[in-house]
């Protein structure tokens, strides 16, 4: 338990019905009792833990500050696993600021960003994946991302990782036995068995990595660029997806001169959608800037939607844009299907893949549902929905998993080549440490500090 007692407002600042001040640490009860007086006249600590108590907060001069409810949560049955007092007051900014200031006067210090959750981690109530899931819950963009974050907060990923670590620890124990007692005939240790154990763990890691793409999209949104030459219906497509007239639509080419960026949920998939200026050669200075932005967005996007005018044949401008997008994850939208098709769909599908070329009318909305279905398959895979397995939450976890797999691959190769057992053990131990860094079992202090510094004050 940390020695210092900390406090912070844990609800959003601003006008609201209720605001909450949290006090956590060894002296949380003493701090709370200095400013809160129960209407019954009893001390807060005299009530059973986790009992909501009605009363008032008073200033140092005895004047009334607010009518409140207070609750004392005794360690370890609290968010931080420390003694915690929470005071629920009216949600006005001045009331919250005054009560918080009184906690400082009573001996608490301001909590740092993420310090409550950091203490929950350091006190062993949650692991690092669960701590990261707390912020994912707060920042959820969709029902699917909330469901995934809640699942991770319950420790699903950590359980799988600890299962892998346990299996690898068994490998190390057996290897050490052979190294220390070479004269013994230990049946559990053969090069073939080591290879099999390592291979099983690699398969499990590959399964987790296969979901990393989905987890990242649900957490951060899929950065998507709508590109094409002028007047193919990019802005009309944006408006159709948004179901509102967000972008100006005109029969004149070059109407969109800047990037229009919007966030939307399309069948539960969070998109960060950018409608770009039409890509073409132009002498117009302002339009030229927009075209350059479009080219850059095409390169930076995680998904490119290439729009072509299906009522006309492909031009050299279309071909140049399609070539630029061919090295990116992309889908080809053959727009204006309501006007008849002059584009060779078979040739496009042979070039880009049958499932990546689809017809659509941004005017009549025909084909929009097909695009939504394609997008769900792109994000979730063939299942088309969130599976029951564990998901990697962020780039840190993905990087460590890939490094752990690389170490295990090297261990497997060493076993296949019948290298000394201690060489194999080094690689397996490294994988164990890397997996432990994901859950926080082996992580360094500076990494912990960096992770929790990204949290908001009061969490």
Predicted features along the sequence, with ranges:
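Switch I (G2) and immediately adjacent beta-strands of P-loop GTPase domains
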Residues: 54-65, 70-74, 255-282, 300
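C-terminal-of-GTPase-core extension/linker across diverse P-loop GTPases
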Residues: 2-9, 13, 143-265, 282-284, ...
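A glycine-rich (often HGG/GG-containing) alpha/beta subdomain
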Residues: 1-147, 151, 155, 331
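Generic enzyme active-site microenvironment
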Residues: 273, 307, 333
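Short glycine-/small-residue-rich Rossmann-like dinucleotide-binding loops
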Residues: 242, 277-278, 302, 309, ...
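Inter-motif core of Ras-like GTPase G domains
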Residues: 287-311
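Short, Asp-centered acidic motifs that coordinate Mg2+ and/or phosphate
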Residues: 271, 303, 331
């Amino acid at each position: 338990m940390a020695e210092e007692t900390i406090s912070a407002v844990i609800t959003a600042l601003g006008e609201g019905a209720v605001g909450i001040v949290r006090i956590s640490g060894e002296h949380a009860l003493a701090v709370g009792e200095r400013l809160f007086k129960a209407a019954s006249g009893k001390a807060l600590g005299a009530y059973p833990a986790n009992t909501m108590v009605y009363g008032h907060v008073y200033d140092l001069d005895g004047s009334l500050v607010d009518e409140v409810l207070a609750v004392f949560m005794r360690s370890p049955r609290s968010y931080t696993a420390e003694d915690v007092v929470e005071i629920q007051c009216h949600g006005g900014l001045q009331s919250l600021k005054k009560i918080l200031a009184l906690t400082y006067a009573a001996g608490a210090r301001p909590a740092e960003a993420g310090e409550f959750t950091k203490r929950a981690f350091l006190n062993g109530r949650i692991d690092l994946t669960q701590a990261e899931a707390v912020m994912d819950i707060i920042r959820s963009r969709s029902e699917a991302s909330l469901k995934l974050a809640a699942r991770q907060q319950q420790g699903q990923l950590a359980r799988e990782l600890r299962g892998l670590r346990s299996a690898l620890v068994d490998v190390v124990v057996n290897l050490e036995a052979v190294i220390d007692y070479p004269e013994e005939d230990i049946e559990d240790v053969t090069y073939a068995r080591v290879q099999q154990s390592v291979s099983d763990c690699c398969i499990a890691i590959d399964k987790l990595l296969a979901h990393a793409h989905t987890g990242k999209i649900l957490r951060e949104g899929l950065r998507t660029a709508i590109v094409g030459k002028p007047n193919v219906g990019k802005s009309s497509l944006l408006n159709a997806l948004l179901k509102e007239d967000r972008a100006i639509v005109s029969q004149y080419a070059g109407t969109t001169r800047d990037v229009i960026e919007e966030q939307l949920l399309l069948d539960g998939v969070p998109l960060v959608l950018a409608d770009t200026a039409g890509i073409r050669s132009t002498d117009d200075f302002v339009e030229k800037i927009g075209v350059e932005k479009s080219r850059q967005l095409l390169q930076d996007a995680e998904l490119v939607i290439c729009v072509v005018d299906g009522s006309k044949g492909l031009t050299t401008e279309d071909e140049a844009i399609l070539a630029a997008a061919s090295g990116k994850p992309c889908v080809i939208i053959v727009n204006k299907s309501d006007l008849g098709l002059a584009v060779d769909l078979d040739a496009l599908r042979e070039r880009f893949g049958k499932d990546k070329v689809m017809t659509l009318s941004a005017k009549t909305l025909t084909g929009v549902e097909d695009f939504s279905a394609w997008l769900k398959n792109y994000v979730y895979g063939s299942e088309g929905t969130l599976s029951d397995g564990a998901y990697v939450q962020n780039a840190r976890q993905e990087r460590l998993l890939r490094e752990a797999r690389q170490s295990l691959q090297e261990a497997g190769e060493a076993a296949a080549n019948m290298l000394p057992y201690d060489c194999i053990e080094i690689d397996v131990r490294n994988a164990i440490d890397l997996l432990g860094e994901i859950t926080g079992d082996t992580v360094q202090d500076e990494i912990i500090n960096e992770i929790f510094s990204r949290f908001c004050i009061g969490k």
